[in-house]
A protein has these predicted regions:
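C-terminal transmembrane module of polytopic alpha-helical membrane proteins
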Residues: 1-21, 71, 175-280
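Topogenic membrane-insertion module of multi-pass membrane proteins
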Residues: 1-43, 47-48
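N-terminal TM1-TM2 helical hairpin plus the immediately adjacent luminal interfacial "cap"
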Residues: 28-121, 129-143, 211-222
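Hydrophobic alpha-helical transmembrane segments
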Residues: 27-28, 53-61, 157, 162-165, ...
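Internal alpha-helical transmembrane segments of multi-pass membrane proteins
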Residues: 110-118, 122, 145-148, 152, ...
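Membrane-interfacial alpha-helical segments at the cytosolic side of multi-pass membrane proteins
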Residues: 82-105, 156-173, 232-250
Length: 280
């Protein structure tokens, strides 16, 4: 009975955590499902001849492709590779968000900041590089056809880098503010600029050549410039959004020290015992 009760409590804790994640990060979760579904639907309709995929791609005559080109792909392997990368990037970003909420005192406020940063990075990492490409194509008269979800993927990787890097200046400010209070605006600027600096140092540690190869350098069909721009957009947007959102937050280890309480184990145990007591 003891082992059975522990298993039931563990399951209840997981259910409770899933509820909290859904409540706070439903936008992230919905985007991680809806974008791949839209890409698969467009590819299927294109194969069936119902919809011509190029009609949604970015060309000089289709400015709506600045947004819609993200769900258009050039065949199964292009679609599969981008969906795999997008799912992996989204999971990494969500994991970084959840780790951050554990280490930040006001986890609800942190979650709202994360959702805003994710939404901005998702939209702008697709729109800004595509807008630059569209303007250049119209100005030069060149025929350009661009499509794919890869810019969003690299935008999310930039957001991931800034999310991880922002914890370091937040920890430093938390230590400093035990003695002196730092105003909100300088605090936000310090967090944002420090996260950009740390992310840049991380890239140098990895190696700039290796970074460019990861962005597709050497592949004839890869839009390396767009990938770089998307990564930078995600990095900067993430740093700015997190800097302002964390401007009143403090780092804490209290939740880790009271892990059982943070996970709601006792509440889960009470719920399980109540359910068992109602069973005939």
């Amino acid at each position: 009975m003891g082992v059975y009760l522990r298993l039931l409590v563990a399951c209840q804790v997981l259910v409770n955590l899933a509820g909290v994640v859904w409540e706070r990060y439903r936008v992230v979760l919905l985007a991680s499902v809806m974008l791949p579904l839209a890409a698969v639907a467009v590819d299927l309709l294109d194969r069936l001849g119902v919809l011509e995929g190029e009609a949604l791609a970015l060309t000089p005559s289709s400015p709506w492709g600045i947004i819609t080109s993200a769900v258009v792909h050039g065949g199964f392997y292009h679609l599969y590779g981008n969906l795999q990368s997008f799912s992996f990037a989204t999971m990494l970003v969500l994991a970084a968000f959840m780790l951050s909420t554990v280490l930040i005192d006001d986890s609800r406020s942190a979650a709202r900041t994360h959702v805003r940063a994710f939404t901005a990075a998702l939209v702008l990492s697709q729109a800004l590089p595509a807008l630059r490409l569209y303007v250049e194509a119209v100005a030069s008269g060149a025929h350009v056809v661009a499509y794919g979800l890869s810019q969003v993927v690299f935008g999310l990787m930039g957001l991931l880098a800034s999310t991880c890097a922002a914890l370091a200046p937040l920890a430093a400010l938390t230590a400093v503010e035990e003695r002196v209070e730092v105003p909100r605006l300088p605090r936000a600027v310090l967090i944002a600029s420090s996260s950009l600096l740390i992310s840049s140092l991380m890239l140098l540690a990895v190696g700039f050549q290796e970074f460019l190869e990861a962005l597709g350098m050497g592949m004839p069909t890869a839009n390396v410039r767009g990938h770089v721009e998307a990564f930078v957009v995600g990095l900067v947007v993430g740093a700015a959004a997190l800097g302002w959102g964390y401007s009143r937050a403090r780092l804490t280890l209290a939740k880790l020290r009271r892990l059982s309480s943070s996970l709601g184990v006792e509440e889960a145990r009470r719920r399980v015992i109540m359910k068992i007591s109602r069973m005939p």
